């Protein structure tokens, strides 16, 4: 089977979609060598490279964000030409905008099934919180229009993949009739409790034995709720001046809020790492942390939270999001409202628990349920089923 992945959510500076695609290529190489893979993404120049089982097409596209290096894939004619040349057996689109529509049209022209992966719940991510600008009635109309858009696009796919049972239920309620629940995974060869390099990592970061190390990994952006993270840590620092340290790995439009916090009251208590390219180094940071803080309330899955648990570090956050199902330990002390005060209190309560025991148990569950080979074995069964049942005429 030749599978083509098509997305504009692809940055050289990592990201969940990029991680998923890299792991898919690794799975084909190691476990399904008879299959072939094509990847079409935006880039600084038009180019094609071969990476073992995968051929990667980069199409010149303008930069949307210089920091994250995300680009808008606007040259849809080039996409069409590549698909016509490669003639894949199945197309998967990770994009809810113009690239998604192009994938649907190309699938019909080539008479092959097209799958949509609903990686981001963009209606909530971008419309919630706009009420003060649109007014309640305007926001309600915008959400109604967005739901209709989601129905119109995703019902054109042969299947809509969603990595959250709860979100799959939401899309079904909205009228998307082809929803299939799936999962994302974790590289259990890298994200694991061993080796015990905690002492060396904490020394390198300047963290004392008696200090509680909090870790956040992800974009600094409104949809990730990082402003709540910053304000909750400011509260913690005021309440317990020498007890907590925060390491932030990631960059994004809300970086200035973090810098402001560093400049003002929390200068020596926050370390910011804009980008961590090495997965082994990232795993060391997860293992060194006492708690992983996940402030997001609109996540569809939560890869970083899963990686942290696989390394033996429990997660604290705000309850009720679509990623609750990937938390492999109890959430009884999680914040029950989206506020800095509630998140700060949840961190305080969790810090009093036996975190090493929680972490060990969570690691065992995460590594057994969410290994990438297991995830892709299930996903490729869906691919083959869709191909077998696809009506070409």
Regions found by a protein language model. Name each.
Residues 57, 140-197:
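Donor nucleotide-sugar binding/catalytic pocket of nucleotide-sugar-dependent glycosyltransferases
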Residues 83, 154, 275, 284-289:
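Short alpha-helical donor nucleotide-sugar binding micro-motif in glycosyltransferases
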Residues 208-234:
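Conserved donor-binding/catalytic core segment of Leloir-type glycosyltransferases
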Residues 256-276, 280:
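Nucleotide-activated donor-binding/catalytic signature segment of Leloir-type glycosyltransferases, i.e.
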Residues 297:
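Aromatic "clamp/platform" in nucleotide-sugar-dependent glycosyltransferases that forms part
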């Amino acid at each position: 089977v030749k599978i083509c992945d098509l997305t504009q959510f692809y940055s050289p500076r990592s990201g969940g979609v990029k991680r998923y695609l890299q792991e898919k290529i690794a799975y084909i190489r190691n476990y399904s060598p008879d299959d072939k893979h094509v990847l079409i993404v935006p880039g600084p120049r038009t180019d094609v490279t071969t990476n073992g089982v995968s051929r990667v097409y980069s199409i010149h596209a303008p930069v949307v964000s210089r920091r994250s290096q995300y680009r808008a894939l606007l040259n849809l004619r080039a996409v069409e030409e590549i698909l016509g040349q490669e003639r894949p057996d199945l197309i998967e689109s990770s994009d809810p905008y113009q690239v998604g529509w192009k994938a649907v049209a190309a699938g019909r022209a080539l008479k092959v099934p097209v799958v949509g992966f609903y990686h981001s719940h963009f209606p909530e991510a971008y419309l919630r919180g706009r009420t003060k600008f649109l007014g309640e009635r305007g926001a309600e109309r915008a959400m109604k229009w967005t739901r209709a858009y989601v129905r119109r696009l995703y019902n054109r796919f042969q299947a809509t993949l969603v990595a959250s049972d709860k979100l799959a239920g939401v899309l079904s309620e909205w009228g998307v009739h082809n929803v299939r629940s799936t999962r994302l995974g974790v590289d259990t060869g890298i994200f694991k409790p061993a080796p015990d390099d905690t002492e060396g990592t904490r020394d390198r970061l300047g963290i004392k034995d008696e200090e509680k190390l909090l870790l956040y990994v992800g974009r600094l952006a409104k949809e990730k709720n990082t402003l709540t993270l910053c304000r909750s840590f400011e509260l913690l620092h005021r309440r317990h001046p020498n007890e907590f340290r925060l390491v932030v790995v990631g960059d994004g439009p809300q970086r200035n809020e973090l810098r402001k916090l560093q400049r003002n009251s929390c200068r020596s208590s926050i370390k910011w790492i804009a980008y961590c390219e090495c997965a082994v180094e990232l795993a060391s940071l997860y293992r060194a942390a006492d708690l992983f803080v996940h402030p997001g309330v609109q996540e569809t899955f939560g890869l970083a939270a899963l990686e942290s648990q696989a390394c033996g570090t429990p997660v604290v956050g705000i309850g009720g999001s679509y990623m609750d199902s990937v938390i492999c330990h109890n959430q009884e002390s999680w914040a029950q409202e989206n506020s800095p005060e509630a998140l700060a209190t949840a961190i305080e309560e969790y810090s009093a628990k036996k975190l090493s025991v929680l972490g060990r148990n969570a690691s065992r569950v995460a590594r057994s349920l969410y290994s990438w080979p297991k995830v892709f074995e299930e996903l490729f069964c869906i691919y083959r089923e869709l191909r077998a049942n696809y009506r070409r005429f």
